[in-house]
């Protein structure tokens, strides 16, 4: 992989250490759909995957992020990171972005379309979180938010024919790893064929549950944050986490 060579040249010692990693890789894994919450949290994981000859396809789907300006900054940084390594990057709201609302009188501008897509996606996320607005961080609202994003990621993996998906959320020490893994496992189960689904032709997908905080990846994340001069957010993303920081 071209990006594998590029990464190892940046830091030979760390690449060698990663090769000796004790992280368990599913047998036969060659590609993984990697849900990315942000560029900083993705950086060390992507480097690790490439060092182990696993192709990451980055999927950016985070309708929880508020406000729109913050969302656009984080998305742009994620895309910049992927493009710098020649890695495929998929916009989770790409279908909405590509649609053009036209009439006899006007064609929707790019700026208006971006704003409409963001507002629509965030409103749907808020509806899914209804009733949990006052829950604390790492509580039941976060668990539901993880599942909301993992379900869409699982569906995208199934659509693309990629048998495994994972998430960079599992790299954050501020998040509950058990909640994240439970959300991923449930999402994989919910998109698969059920025992009674006679004639079901949907391909099974699997969640790669992993603690991406181990093996020096947290320290490597911090180093890459400076190396790439990434924007480093100060709160999780949603308005509720933003208020909890104020």
Annotate each PLM feature.
Residues 4, 11-99, 113-193, 201-246:
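Nucleotide-activated chemistry modules centered on ATP-dependent adenylation/adenylyltransferase
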């Amino acid at each position: 992989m071209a990006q594998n060579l590029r990464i190892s040249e940046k830091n030979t010692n760390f690449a060698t250490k990663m090769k000796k990693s004790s992280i368990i890789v599913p047998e036969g894994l060659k590609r993984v759909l990697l849900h990315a919450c942000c560029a900083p949290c993705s950086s060390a994981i992507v480097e690790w995957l490439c060092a182990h000859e696993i192709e990451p396809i980055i999927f950016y789907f985070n309708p929880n992020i508020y406000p729109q300006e913050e969302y656009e900054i984080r998305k742009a940084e994620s895309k910049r990171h992927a493009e710098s390594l020649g890695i495929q990057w998929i916009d989770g709201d790409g279908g909405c972005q590509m649609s053009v609302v036209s009439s006899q009188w006007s064609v929707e501008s790019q700026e208006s379309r971006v704003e409409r897509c963001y507002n629509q996606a965030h409103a749907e996320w808020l509806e899914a979180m209804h009733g949990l607005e006052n829950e604390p961080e790492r509580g039941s609202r976060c668990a539901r938010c993880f599942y909301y994003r993992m379900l869409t990621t699982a569906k995208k993996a199934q659509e693309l024919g990629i048998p495994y998906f994972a998430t960079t959320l599992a790299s954050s020490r501020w998040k509950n790893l058990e909640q994240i893994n439970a959300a991923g496992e449930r999402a994989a189960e919910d998109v698969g064929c059920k025992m009674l689904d006679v004639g079901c032709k949907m391909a099974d997908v699997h969640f790669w549950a992993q603690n991406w905080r181990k093996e020096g990846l947290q320290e490597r994340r911090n180093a890459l944050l400076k190396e790439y001069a990434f924007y480093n957010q100060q709160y999780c993303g949603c308005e509720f986490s933003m208020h909890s920081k104020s």
